[in-house]
A protein has these predicted regions:
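Gly/Ser/Thr-enriched, mixed-charge loops and adjacent short helices
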Residues: 35, 125-251
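N-terminal small/polar loop signature for handling phosphorylated ligands or for N-terminal nucleophile
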Residues: 50, 61-125, 210-269
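Phosphate-binding and adjacent anionic-ligand microenvironments
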Residues: 293-380
Length: 380
């Protein structure tokens, strides 16, 4: 099950390989994932983090985790393993994935480790290494870590242990970064009302604060952190967002938004309660942002629709397509200095903030969009 639900191939030597042919693959499309205490054991976490420590070599690593029941105990193993390899760790605590990523970059860390299984069922957990630029490490660097892991070529010859301390700067650093990219006064002038389906996930920590700091009234549902995601599950889908649509209609809200388990993706609905697909919301934002920033680049996956082509043509911009996977989009955005990246599943990336999927940043951009133009007009 490690590596996004691929079966673990176990022989007499633990974790010889993963996949149908035991090819020695750990990373899936987004980090390393497995079922906690089955294939994603604490022993496995220790060995994986030793491999990540060997890859990072030195410096201080920022560690964060989502609200899953196993996340906090895994964070203790992560930090102690980093320390045993001579690397210091700062613990950000329970934060959304994009918060950890932005803080890693902005606060000058050598790297980050996010403990999350994103939208996977509650019994899963995972580890996502983040580079010093605030973006998930490249496929090439994933291969380096896998080689270290399977060869057990760990750097354990350290004369000094590292240490762990708490760092409470990440959340406000993240919120300040988002606010710096939008017209706060414009948003505040509209006195917007927003329905938030927090999905019992990590955006509970930041999304309400963000809306309040942008002068918005909020209606929150599924707002208690719950590692079992008892409200509607960790993955927002058209089949489990009826409560969000009803909250928008019943409270005369201007916008509704639902987040996945770790808060890097967002699904929106308009002020009539109609849900927007990930592609549709990405097109609305792209059209808005490219009109403000013509001659820009947009990166998206090969499985996204072709509607973006007309928008980029009208704004003298270009679209670049990549393999499926947020890492592919993020890394291509960096190399091309792209303004926008998106996936059809609700993952939207705004390059001026960070080249990663970010449910909070996407929400703020949507609030600015509807502050300038009625979303119903945009949808027409």
């Amino acid at each position: 099950r490690l590596g996004d639900s691929r079966k673990l191939c176990v022989t007499t030597d633990k974790f010889i390989g993963i996949g149908l042919h035991c090819m020695g693959k750990l990373f899936g499309t987004n980090g390393v994932r497995g079922v906690f205490s089955e294939d994603f054991t604490l022993e496995f976490v220790h060995d994986l983090v030793l491999s990540i420590s060997t890859y990072f070599k030195e410096g201080t690593i920022l560690v964060g985790y989502d609200g899953r029941n196993s996340s906090k105990v895994i964070s203790k193993i992560v930090c102690s393993t980093l320390n045993s390899a001579g690397i210091n760790s700062d613990l950000a605590g329970l934060v959304p994935t994009p918060c950890l990523e932005f803080a890693t970059k902005t606060l000058g860390y050598n790297g980050g480790i996010m403990i999350t299984a994103s939208h996977n069922p509650p019994e899963y957990n995972g580890i996502k290494p983040v580079a010093s630029d605030g973006v998930e490490i490249s496929r090439e660097d994933e291969n380096v870590i896998e080689e270290i892991f399977f060869q057990k070529n760990w750097n354990q010859n350290t004369s000094e242990f590292g240490s762990t301390k708490n760092d409470d700067r990440s959340i406000q650093t993240y919120l300040d970064g988002i606010k710096s990219q939008v017209d706060i006064s414009k948003i505040k002038s509209k006195n917007l009302k927003v329905a938030l389906d927090l999905g019992n996930g990590a955006q509970t920590i930041t999304a309400i604060k963000l809306c309040e700091q942008l002068g918005c009234e909020t209606i929150a549902i599924n707002q208690e952190i719950d590692g079992t995601f008892s409200g509607r599950g960790p993955e927002p889908t058209p089949y489990n967002l009826e409560e969000l649509s009803s909250a928008v209609v019943n409270n005369n809200a201007d916008l509704g938004v639902a987040f996945d388990g770790d808060g890097d993706r967002s699904i929106f609905c308009d002020n009539t309660g109609k849900l927007l697909s990930g592609d549709k919301s990405a097109l609305l934002l792209s059209n808005y942002l490219l009109k403000k920033n013509p001659n820009s680049k947009v990166v998206t996956c090969i499985n996204s629709g072709n509607s973006i082509d007309e928008i980029v043509t009208q704004t003298d911009s270009t679209v670049i397509r990549t393999k499926v996977g947020s890492v592919e989009v993020s890394r291509k955005m960096l190399s091309e200095n792209a303004l926008i990246g998106f996936e059809e599943n609700g993952g939207f990336m705004f390059g001026k903030h960070n080249h990663v999927r970010d449910g909070g940043m996407t929400l703020a951009l949507f609030l600015e969009l509807i502050s300038n133009k009625d979303i119903i007009e945009e949808l027409a």
